[in-house]
Amino acid sequence: MNKIIFVLVISFFSILSLQAQSKELGVASEIRNILESSSLGELSHDSKVNFSQYDLLIKFYSKREFKEAWTKEGGLSSQALVLRDQVRESLYDGLVPEDYYLGQLDDIIMNFEIEKMGENALQLAYVDLIFSESYLKLATDLYKGKTPQEAIKTNWQIQAKTVKVKFEEVLESAVKGDSIGQSIRGFWPEYKVYANIRESLRDYYKMASSQEENTPELEYKKLIKLGDRNRLIVEIRSRLIGEGSEVDSELYDSALLKEVLKVQKRFGLNPDGVIGPATISALNETPEDMILRIAVNLERLRWLPDTVVEDKFIMVNIANYQLDYVQDNGLDTLFSSKVIVGKQYRSTPVFNGEMSYIVFSPTWTVPLSIVRGEMIPKIKRDPSYLSRNHMKILTYSGKEVDPAGLEWSTVSVKNFPYMVRQSPGPHNSLGLVKFIFPNKFNVYIHDTPSKSLFDKDIRAFSHGCIRLHKPAEFAEVILQDNALWDKEKIYEAMHSGKETAVMLKKKIPVVILYLTFWTDTGGKNYIRKDIYNRDEEIARALFQ
């Protein structure tokens, strides 16, 4: 055997003594010996393959009596080539093909083509184990995510996916059925948006490979409106329309306006056609930037539990400032509304729960953190603050306390043993209705009296809860299966001034997501600002 070929595939110098025995043993015996001895550790060192799926390898091979899966009569099976191609394709899952030993697989395949490798059972055993390790590692990362979500410091609290798949059994079935490619794709998340995003990533890799180097970054200096002349328009036109058009290249005309509007809509900006700092920032996004962004969001989808995919569920995308009530795997939208989410320092957490009831004309018991951090200083400055905001001070047993009887000069954030509660009504910070899905964060969806904030592009203003733009319409949709609660009765309850709770006949799954990129069924891409700066940490974990 040519030593150069050994270097390309596996260094066998540490196991020369075992090779002499391999002629007398079958491949199955060699696989068993390797798995039951220290030889796998030697192989890890020599081949630079980290056999992280050892437990699954044992299960897989023991059930098939340690028979080889990827070679036949001394040659590689066609499914080995399919696996190599699937590993290469993992690039478009936002993964790194080298993590699944693409280089080693390529070398093995090349060496089988150059020279007969089937004369050595030990060598065939090692080849088989490397292919199985590659498959199982890729399968588990596609199914659960490459990075354990608990290792990410950002506030991701969605219930981890329950592993129901027996990877070794899927591999066995795929080997028998010559369906390796189909089985790998079967590990993708159930959400149809995943495949859509994946194709977008493929497109951005093509853009990155064809992009001219050193593309200048656009520098914002002043607002540019339709009809304005500006040197920056030359570069913007080149990027969005292309060169060679016989027009006044510095004039912001209607043809360019159409393209600018597309960019603004794609990035979730106000589509007013005015080229300002946010639009310039969007235009400066490179294909490389988008590749990282897409990879991060594909990983987020892999983290989601399958239980999120229900007949109907409520989805809030924090980064998109939008709530959607959907069915049919998210393809059919029953209701949509703008939302306001938490400020950066009081960010809305990512989690899932079940909506179980609605409260009309709610009171608001102010969280202690807000009382201490914001209200006490305001009350000290303005004795009328509480009455003007329809608030009362209560003991924890529910007894009302006269604020005039408190010695406010001695009250501090550390010694305020009371609750502050706001009465129902249009003045209430929760508005006229709240939607409850019990959770440890005390986060819920609610109305708000501050309607003007929904006109903003960036809507991160709350203390963590989710404010809804169209609460009455949402209540109607949620209660449409309850004949006792029609539009008129809902309106009456919202304006009654009396707190009224209504239990839902069936709990509705709620998932609070954070996606900064997605692709719809028509292939349109949507990009959103990373308002909580959460993408970078996941990107580092994926590509470190």
Predicted regions and their residues:
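Bacterial N-terminal signal peptides
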Residues: V7-I15
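Well-ordered beta-sheet/strand-loop patches within structured domains
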Residues: Q21-R64, L129, L136-K137, W156, ...
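Cationic-aromatic interfacial patches
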Residues: S22-V163
